[in-house]
């Protein structure tokens, strides 16, 4: 499918630089492809058309007792590193690296800038600027150089010692569309983290989850909505542009995830008794769809997934999706177009832009019903 079909114009002022306060006061666009045609309209109590405007705190009224929300409990780490590259004893040059996937106790895949300056065998001293050392030695060797600035870094430290050094030296890797407008600050350490984050390893937040508050959790509990947690460590590749002209030619980035046997069994039980699987965020959806068999049964999962969902994909397990508003030409806009329908999502985004919804990581949310349900 042509990538330019997923393009659209977004005014700069629609990009959110800070989250709504409180978190669940963000707007919620409910997108129900079936509402106008009638047969499924009763499943959306307040929606008289395919698109209806609400707030995140209204979420319980769109769900039924016995439905299950699936959250990604990954925790963002300060994965943005600044350092000095050394080669053959010569003077150093400043470089930056964004860690995006751990591949061993001391090894990480990272995106380095400027990538052209880096070669295999280079040494990088992170936490240093010129001759000054800020926070101890976090040194690495460039073990391998790939495409698009990707490198494999072998750190001198390992295990918990490496984690502590990264936490001391690193910065929260704000998405490029925010970082281009303002620097990271102390507020982002809290704002760019879900309230239920517990499994360290992400370099980008599962942003749909940023809208949840203790009060919203209490309302969902009262409504009989189940909560289940899976883990997908979101990588920096989520921000990579699609450079191919056709979706068939795009190579999807890998992200590592985990679905326990217990959670798989609980979600299958929800489906068996007629409940719906409602994924909070595209990351939990991609993980659940990776773990699901052709029969729709969810299996335990541990490993990397590079699932790339575009229109024509047949969803196996997920019934509804809550997600933020995504970038033009992005793999995530392709995913939501597959989920609720290409024309439906183009109309939804046109409506969101014209009525002042806030886009991207700190922006508003949408609740999507699956087009083939």
Swiss-Prot record:
CC per GO annotation: cytoplasm
Reaction equation(s) it catalyzes: 7-aminomethyl-7-carbaguanosine(34) in tRNA + S-adenosyl-L-methionine = epoxyqueuosine(34) in tRNA + adenine + L-methionine + 2 H(+)
UniProt GO BP: queuosine biosynthetic process; tRNA wobble guanine modification
Keywords (A to Z) from UniProt: Cytoplasm, Queuosine biosynthesis, S-adenosyl-L-methionine, Transferase
SUPFAM superfamilies given in the database record: QueA-like
InterPro entries the UniProt entry points to: QueA, QueA_dom1, QueA_dom2, QueA_sf
Main localization, broad class: cytoplasm
EC number: 2.4.99.17
Record Pfam families: Queuosine_synth (PF02547)
One Gene Ontology molecular-function label: S-adenosylmethionine:tRNA ribosyltransferase-isomerase activity
UniProt pathway annotation: tRNA modification; tRNA-queuosine biosynthesis
Compartments in which it is found: Cytoplasm
Subunit structure: Monomer.
PANTHER family associated with the record: S-ADENOSYLMETHIONINE:TRNA RIBOSYLTRANSFERASE-ISOMERASE (PTHR30307:SF0)
NCBIfam families recorded: PRK00147.1, queA
Entry function: Transfers and isomerizes the ribose moiety from AdoMet to the 7-aminomethyl group of 7-deazaguanine (preQ1-tRNA) to give epoxyqueuosine (oQ-tRNA).
Designated name of the protein: S-adenosylmethionine:tRNA ribosyltransferase-isomerase
Organism whose genome encodes this protein: Rhizobium etli (strain CIAT 652)
Origin organism lineage: Bacteria, Pseudomonadati, Pseudomonadota, Alphaproteobacteria, Hyphomicrobiales
